[in-house]
């Protein structure tokens, strides 16, 4: 919201500097982005009167004699603008002047002709193209005839005004109007507002003879209109054009400019229809039908849906409610009779339509946040009165209206104790009365219980907490006492989840992995790509891009994108990990939030060790990846099993293992399927993913310190003849099933296959370590332990001790 300080001072008696005002507003709840003066950096710009204008042969140039109020007489200026002509008033930069981009104007010669200055366009003064009147977009600015040669252009075009840019949050949409800002400033400084009133002088003919209106949508609360006949469409007076341009709005003509003025003044969006272009007199506000089309004022054809609001005549859309009018009923220079519209449209519907069509306007931004119900009809009458003044129109008697809005003040009750407890203050009831008097709110009751009557212009206030905020703002945040919050002391230790994440991060980085952070949002296909049992997809309704539309259910797909990114840049040795959340949705994604699961994953590709003069290159393989996982679980003191699996279509069927904890699959480990790797454009890659939330539940509580035993351990080796399909895990399970408490370690140190063993057989050799923390082990005890283990191996895996 751009606020003219000149205009603001007409509405409220304030005599502080804009810097002070900006600081005060920012500290009371409305952020000021900055203050700028359009004339800043400009100098020596005056009104000029073109006395003569001669074409320069064989060029686009014109040799002009221009009166700039100098005693020496007219000055000669060479100008190339297509709309320069004798008799007009223009903007002249005299020698020594500064225009946009700090460009200095000097005396010079053009095609041998002396030029003592420059005739300027608004663009050359630094105004953006978007606000320059279209008739002057490709040429110089032509000033009204009453402009006096030699006068400074700054006050004439209000370039010396100070423009305050406000950043309006959705809860303070009341400040999207000059009246709203004036109320705010008046409350801050304890001043009163004075808004000019306009009285409509109505013709005897009733407006209802010309039009009728109806509402056929629950998204339209009220729809009111007035008819103004015999208007003269022409450029607006300079003061109105200046005001609109300083507010960032392009002047069009006096009729359209009046509706934009009222929008800025009241915050009430309005629209003007050419009455003679309406096919019939009955106007209906209704929901659009699927597939209906409307060409809007910007010349674009829009396809509508049932969620849109349209204004129709003869059952044909002529305006997109709350956003933009239609081209078919546009006001032009030939328009004579005008229908003014003031309505209240549903903000949610306007926002959806505006977003879907990518069509933002000053009107839509206000309807989205809300408008003041109190001034809908007042704004309509004000606009009609302005058309009487500026377009010589005749206003027909009465408004034509359908629907109504509630204009009764909102009653909110609270108590002095409630306020003081929440602000930590010792305010008196007199302080409360003073605050609400400044705000212009009614107040009844006493300290024990009082009721505030909130005008409809402040629709953001509805509960006690809102009143407390208003009191704090106007009383002054800087006056609130500084106190420390009262809370029970808490220990500064890490949570179990934080501790686990730190341990995993330390182990992963110790294994040579580099941490990455990938996008939580991905494509629907990648979201479920590495999920063994995918849950329902949680997708965004309006994603920024199609590649970021669904919440991920795995980390691996994002990691493979990172691997591909590195490989494409000649970094073929990749070792990365991530700790992040994946999302499981077991219900309806539109009604329920997904479960967030802490997850760890890594991806490795390329070489573990580079080739040098004495060692061979060592490529990444399944066992290297498994070693990282084993190291992780060993450090965490969590026992897991590895079970071969073919359930994951994106993983190699012969080199993938499910990671099982207490009978529950908590992750997987293995090689990415060659076809999947090809799809990603990456070489042979190994990945793993683990559900850290499940691991956290399995963590053992912190163990008390146990003294290191002084008694030695005893080791025994055992070689087993086994069937070739017996796995290492099955052998371990058999050994531990013997229940030997003194067995503290089992290590596989040899695997052998060959013809001597026979077909389908293999040999596996293990080192078993025993230890008694309280005594020396005897040979007899160790022999008994070995006997029990041998028996278990024979029974469980049909092992034969070699």
UniProtKB/Swiss-Prot annotation:
Keywords assigned by UniProt, alphabetized: Aminoacyl-tRNA synthetase, ATP-binding, Cytoplasm, Ligase, Magnesium, Metal-binding, Nucleotide-binding, Protein biosynthesis, RNA-binding, tRNA-binding
Any GO MF annotation of the entry: transferase activity
Species annotation: Streptococcus thermophilus (strain ATCC BAA-250 / LMG 18311)
Domain tRNA-binding positions: 39-154
Reaction it catalyzes: tRNA(Phe) + L-phenylalanine + ATP = L-phenylalanyl-tRNA(Phe) + AMP + diphosphate + H(+)
Broad class of enzyme this protein falls into: ligase
Name of protein: Phenylalanine--tRNA ligase beta subunit
InterPro entries: aa-tRNA-synth_II/BPL/LPL, B3/B4_tRNA-bd, DNA-bd_dom_put_sf, Fdx_antiC-bd, Fdx_antiC-bd_sf, NA-bd_OB-fold, Phe-tRNA-ligase_IIc_bsu, Phe-tRNA-ligase_IIc_bsu_bact
Required cofactor(s): Mg(2+)
PROSITE patterns the record matches: B5, FDX_ACB, TRBD
Subunit structure: Tetramer of two alpha and two beta subunits.
Cofactor note: Binds 2 magnesium ions per tetramer.
Domain B5: 407-482
Binding locations of Mg(2+): 460, 466, 469-470
GO biological process, alphabetically ordered: phenylalanyl-tRNA aminoacylation
SUPFAM superfamilies per record: Anticodon-binding domain of PheRS, Class II aaRS and biotin synthetases, Nucleic acid-binding proteins, PheT/TilS domain, Putative DNA-binding domain
Compartments reported by the entry: Cytoplasm
Residues covered by the FDX-ACB domain: 709-802
């Amino acid at each position: 919201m751009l606020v003219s300080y000149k205009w603001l001072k007409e509405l409220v008696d304030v005599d502080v500097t804009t810097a002070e005002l900006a600081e005060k507003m920012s500290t009371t709840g409305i952020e000021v982005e900055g203050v700028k003066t359009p004339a800043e950096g400009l100098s020596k710009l005056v009104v000029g009167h073109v006395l003569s204008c001669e074409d320069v042969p064989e060029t686009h140039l014109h040799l002009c004699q221009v009166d700039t109020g100098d005693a020496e007489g007219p000055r000669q200026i060479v100008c190339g603008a297509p709309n320069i002509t004798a008799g007009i008033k223009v903007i002249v930069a005299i020698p020594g002047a500064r225009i946009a981009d700090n460009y200095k104007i000097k005396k010079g010669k053009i095609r041998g002709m002396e030029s003592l200055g420059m005739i300027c366009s608004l663009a050359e003064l630094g105004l953006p193209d978007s606000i320059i009147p279209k008739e002057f977009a490709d040429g110089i600015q032509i000033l009204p005839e009453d402009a006096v040669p030699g006068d400074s252009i700054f006050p004439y075009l209000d370039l010396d005004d100070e423009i305050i840019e406000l950043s309006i949050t959705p809860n303070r949409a009341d400040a999207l109007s000059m009246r709203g800002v004036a109320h705010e400033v008046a409350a801050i400084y304890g001043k009163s507002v004075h808004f000019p009133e306009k009285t409509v002088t109505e013709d005897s003919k009733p407006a209802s003879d010309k039009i009728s209106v109806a509402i056929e949508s629950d998204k339209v609360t009220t729809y009111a209109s007035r008819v103004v006949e015999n208007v003269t469409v022409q450029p607006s007076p300079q003061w109105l054009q200046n005001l609109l341009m300083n507010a960032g709005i392009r002047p069009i003509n006096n009729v359209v400019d009046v509706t934009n003025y009222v929008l800025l003044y009241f915050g009430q969006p309005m629209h003007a229809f050419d009455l003679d272009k309406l096919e019939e007199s009955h106007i209906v506000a209704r929901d659009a039908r699927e597939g209906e089309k409307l060409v809007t004022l910007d010349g674009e054809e829009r396809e509508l849906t049932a969620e849109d609001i349209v204004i129709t005549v003869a059952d044909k859309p002529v305006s997109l409610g709350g956003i933009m009018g239609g081209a078919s009923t546009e006001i032009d220079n030939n328009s004579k009779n005008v229908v003014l519209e003031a309505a209240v449209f549903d903000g949610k519907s306007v926002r959806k339509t505006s977003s879907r069509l990518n069509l933002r306007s000053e009107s839509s931004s206000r309807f989205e946040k809300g408008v003041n119900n109190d001034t809908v009809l007042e704004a309509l009458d004000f606009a009609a009165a302005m058309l009487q003044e500026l377009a010589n129109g005749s206003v027909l008697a009465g408004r034509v209206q359908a629907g109504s809005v509630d204009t009764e003040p909102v009653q909110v009750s609270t108590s002095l104790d409630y306020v003081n407890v929440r602000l930590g203050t010792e305010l008196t009831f007199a302080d409360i009365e003073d605050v609400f008097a400044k705000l212009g709110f009614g107040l009844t009751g006493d300290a024990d219980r009082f009721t505030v009557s909130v005008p409809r212009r402040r629709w953001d206030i509805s509960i006690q907490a809102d009143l407390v905020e208003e009191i704090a703002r106007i009383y002054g945040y800087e006056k609130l006492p500084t106190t420390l919050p009262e809370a029970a002391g808490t220990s500064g230790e890490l949570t179990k989840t934080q501790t686990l994440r730190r341990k995993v991060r330390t182990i992963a980085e110790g294994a040579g992995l580099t941490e990455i952070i990938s996008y939580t949002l991905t494509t629907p296909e990648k979201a479920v790509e590495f999920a063994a049992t995918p849950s329902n997809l949680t997708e965004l309704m309006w994603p920024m891009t199609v590649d970021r539309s669904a919440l991920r259910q795995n980390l691996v797909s994002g990691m493979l994108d990172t691997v591909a990114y590195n490989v494409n840049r000649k970094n073929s040795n990749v070792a990365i990990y991530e700790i992040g959340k994946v999302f499981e949705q077991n219900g309806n994604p539109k009604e329920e939030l997904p479960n967030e699961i802490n997850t760890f994953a890594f991806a490795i590709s390329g070489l573990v060790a580079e080739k040098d003069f004495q060692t061979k290159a060592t490529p990444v393989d399944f066992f290297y990846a498994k070693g990282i996982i084993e190291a992780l679980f060993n450090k965490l003191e969590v026992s897991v099993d590895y079970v071969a699996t073919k359930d994951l279509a994106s993983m190699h069927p012969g080199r993938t293992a499910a990671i099982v904890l207490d009978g529950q699959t908590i992750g997987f480990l293995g090689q990415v399927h060659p076809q999947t790797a090809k799809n990603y454009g990456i070489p042979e890659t190994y990945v793993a993913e683990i559900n850290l939330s499940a691991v956290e539940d399995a963590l053992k509580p912190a163990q008390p310190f146990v003294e290191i035993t002084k008694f030695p351990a005893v080791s025994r080796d055992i070689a087993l003849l086994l069937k070739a399909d017996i796995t290492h895990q099955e052998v371990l399970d058999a050994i531990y099933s013997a229940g030997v408490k003194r067995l503290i370690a089992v290590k596989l140190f040899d695997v052998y296959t060959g013809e001597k063993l026979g077909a389908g057989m293999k040999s596996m050799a293990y080192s078993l370590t025993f230890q008694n923390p309280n005594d020396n082990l005897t040979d007899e005890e160790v022999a008994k332990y070995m006997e029990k283990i041998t028996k278990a191996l024979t029974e469980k895996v049909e092992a034969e001790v070699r």
